[in-house]
């Protein structure tokens, strides 16, 4: 280990919890091919997960990434997940057009040089390596500037230290600065809805719920099929992949920058709209509209996709 790396790690240890490292990258391709390109390495706040639960044993997700010590090959962290690209490449557009999607991997900052391996599930169920990257925790190119000052984090419900709890982050999109009171009320209402439903009701004390204020210039989000276009703070939009009720955030970097102000493992984006809609992608995020009569059902339903990789009942 270099002297610089040793100094960095000693300073981190003296400061307390291990920081979170985020790898931002671009996933490009079509139905026939794909490629990965590094965008940035970003240092976030303290890692919210428990150090004894760093390895994902669920075997869920279309993709999996592993962090291994570069010298010994020891597995330090792993996580299965799904992605927007993984859904898009099954569409008819992907048969004729190539597109690019911004994605991120988050994990505790390694104590020494490490290798990150991203794999995709093959037809036989096994994982095959698609991309790898070597990282150095002392790399001066790592962005240590911190979260944007405009993102304000507040506590909806705290039942313990982040490392000992499941940390859920709620982010509102399409709420103006004058609608922050509504956003706070919506976040609290949805939290109560989640914990009124089993099995979350029985495990309420195992969760922390955080929220972040990200004001938009206009109220509401884009609904292209209705002729409504908004440049909301997170750029959430209905009509994802041509499905009118499917709500996604395609600007991953904007979303991750806002979320970086909070400790989180799971995230649900609440859009300030009355139209039925939502979505849930395993270990990425979930979305829901705030003011539809089906919002309570959709909120819990989409969180199930995101949190546990649950399939739809009709599949």
Q: Where is each model-derived feature located?
A:
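Short amphipathic, basic-aromatic surface patches that mediate peripheral association
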Residues: 17-56
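Short coil-to-beta strand junction motifs in C2/discoidin
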Residues: 52-63, 186
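Solvent-exposed serine/threonine-rich low-complexity stretches and specific carbohydrate-binding patches
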Residues: 76-96, 132-137, 180
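Extended acidic/polar, glycine-enriched regions
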Residues: 95-162
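Fold-level signature of zinc-dependent metallopeptidase catalytic domains
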Residues: 140-201, 211-221
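Short pre-active-site segment immediately N-terminal to the catalytic Zn-binding motif
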Residues: 182-183, 278-302
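Active-site-proximal segments of metallohydrolase catalytic domains
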Residues: 206-282
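Catalytic Zn2+-binding segment of zinc metalloproteases
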Residues: 303-315
